[in-house]
Amino acid sequence: MDKVGKMWNNFKYRCQNLFGHEGGSRSENVDMNSNRCLSVKEKNISIGDSTPQQQSSPLRENIALQLGLSPSKNSSRRNQNCATEIPQIVEISIEKDNDSCVTPGTRLARRDSYSRHAPWGGKKKHSCSTKTQSSLDADKKFGRTRSGLQRRERRYGVSSVHDMDSVSSRTVGSRSLRQRLQDTVGLCFPMRTYSKQSKPLFSNKRKIHLSELMLEKCPFPAGSDLAQKWHLIKQHTAPVSPHSTFFDTFDPSLVSTEDEEDRLRERRRLSIEEGVDPPPNAQIHTFEATAQVNPLYKLGPKLAPGMTEISGDSSAIPQANCDSEEDTTTLCLQSRRQKQRQISGDSHTHVSRQGAWKVHTQIDYIHCLVPDLLQITGNPCYWGVMDRYEAEALLEGKPEGTFLLRDSAQEDYLFSVSFRRYNRSLHARIEQWNHNFSFDAHDPCVFHSSTVTGLLEHYKDPSSCMFFEPLLTISLNRTFPFSLQYICRAVICRCTTYDGIDGLPLPSMLQDFLKEYHYKQKVRVRWLEREPVKAK
C-alpha cells in the first residue's frame, strides 16, 4: 500500500505541475529517459519557459480553479516513458477537427464528475507540443462548451444559457405531448406529420360508375387526379375505329414505347372485332348467326363453323358439319363490348336457339386464296395433310431447330409448323389477319409477312428468333412428291382469285377443290339484335 500511495502522490504532483501559479518559478526540464518518445529538438525544451504574462493569464487561473487544482512548486518530472504519452497523442488526433473551428472568448463549462475524478482527467499534452501546449487544451475546452451552447441555441432558439432557462420554462408547458416526444426522439426517428389541408382530399371519396369512364368528355372536376389521367382512361376504354380521331389528336411525344405497343394492340383487337375495309370491287359474303352467349367462352378472331351464309336474298341454310356446341359461339358473341350496337331495322331470316341471351350478328367478309400456294407446294419442308402425332414421330430425335410445314388440323387455320426446341417437339399455328401471316395475329409487334414462305424464311435466322418463338433453322424434307392434281391447283390459284374460280368452265366439284386453300377476311360486323330470351 505504501508503494501505491507513493505512486499516486507522484502522479498527482505531475498533474499539478501543468497548472503553475502566478509568480512561480517552474523550471522543469524533461529527463533524458524521454528520448525514446521525443525528438532531439524537444529534449532541451522547458515547459516553464513561458513568459510571466502567459502564466498570469486569467484563462489559466480559471482552468485551475474549475478543476480544483492548487498551484505547486517546481518539481522535475522523471522516469517518463512512451506508455504514459499514448493516451495524450490519441486524444489530440480525435479532437483535432473540433479545435480548428474554436474561437476564444467563450465561457468554459465544468467538466463532468467522471472526467474530473479520473486519474487521466487532468493530464496534459506536455510532450506533444512546446509553445502551444496550454492553448491547445484551452481551445479544446472552448470547442466542447461552444458546441454544446450552439446545440441548445438551435433547439430552443435562445442565445445564452440564461435565456434558455426562461424560454424552457415558458415553452414546455405549452408544447403538446407529441411535440415533446418528438423533441426527445430527435432526428434519429422522425415522426411523420400530416397537414390539415390534406384531410379533405380523403374525405371527398365517391364511387365512380363504369358509365362515366365511357363518356367522351371528362366528368371529373378540373385539376383532380382522374382529370389529369383522363387521356389514359380513354386509351383503354374508348372504342377505336377507322373513323375515330382520338389517337390522331393524341400527342405522340408523350407516348413511351410501352404505351405505343399497348395502343397498337388495342387497335388490333378492335380491328379484329370490327373488321377491316374491303378492297374495291370485292364480292362481299355475309354470315348471319344466332347463338347463346356464354361469358366463359374465350372470344377469338376466327370464323368457326355453325354460321349461316346467305348470298343476296337467298334464305339462310345452317351448315351440317358443326363439330360441337362450342363452335357456334364465334366472334359475333362478343358480349363484353361496351359500346352501343347499331340496331338495324332490316329484317333478316335467322335460326333462333333458346338460351339466356339471344344475339343476332351479321358478319361481312371476303374470301382470299393463299397468295404463295405454288411456292408452298414446291417447298420440300411442306408435308401436306398431317396431324401433330405424325409430325412428332418424324421429329423425334432430330436436332434443335428441325421443322416441317403441314396443314393445320383445325378448320380455322390453314398451316402449322412443327419444330424441335428445348429437347421436345412443339407446334405453332400460322394465323392470318388483314392479308398478313404471323404466329400471333393479335399482337402487331410480332413479325408478320404477306406470304407463308416469307414467314418461314424470317425464323430461319436464330438472331431474329425470340426464346418463345419457333426456331426454324433445319427443314425436314418430305420423302414423297405431290400429285399432278395438287400441282395444277397451285398453278391455277396463282393466276386467279377466289371469286374468279366461279367463272371458270369447270364442274362444281373441281371449283370446290380449287377453293380449298383460302382464308376468310372479316370486313364488317354488325350487331343487329341483343335481347334476353324469356324462359318457358
Swiss-Prot record:
Pathway: Protein modification; protein ubiquitination. Phosphorylated. Phosphorylation is induced by EGF. Residues 115-175 are annotated as: Disordered. Keywords: Growth regulation, SH2 domain, Signal transduction inhibitor, Ubl conjugation pathway. Changing residue 488 to F: Abrogates the interaction with ELOB and ELOC and the ability to suppress EGFR signaling. GO terms for molecular function: epidermal growth factor receptor binding; receptor tyrosine kinase binding. Gene3D superfamilies: SH2 domain. GO terms for biological process: cell surface receptor signaling pathway via JAK-STAT; cellular response to low-density lipoprotein particle stimulus; cytokine-mediated signaling pathway; epidermal growth factor receptor signaling pathway; intracellular signal transduction; negative regulation of epidermal growth factor-activated receptor activity; negative regulation of inflammatory response; negative regulation of interleukin-6 production. Pfam families: SH2, SOCS, SOCS_box. Changing residue 406 to K: Abrogates the ability to induce EGFR degradation. Residues 471-520 form the SOCS box domain. Residues 381-476 form the SH2 domain. Induction: Up-regulated by EGF (at protein level). The SOCS box domain mediates the interaction with the Elongin BC complex, an adapter module in different E3 ubiquitin ligase complexes. SOCS family proteins form part of a classical negative feedback system that regulates cytokine signal transduction. May be a substrate-recognition component of a SCF-like ECS (Elongin BC-CUL2/5-SOCS-box protein) E3 ubiquitin-protein ligase complex which mediates the ubiquitination and subsequent proteasomal degradation of target proteins. Inhibits for instance EGF signaling by mediating the degradation of the EGF receptor/EGFR. Involved in the regulation of T-helper cell differentiation by inhibiting of the IL4 signaling pathway which promotes differentiation into the Th2 phenotype. This is Suppressor of cytokine signaling 5. It comes from Homo sapiens. The lineage of its organism: Eukaryota, Metazoa, Chordata, Craniata, Vertebrata. The gene is SOCS5.
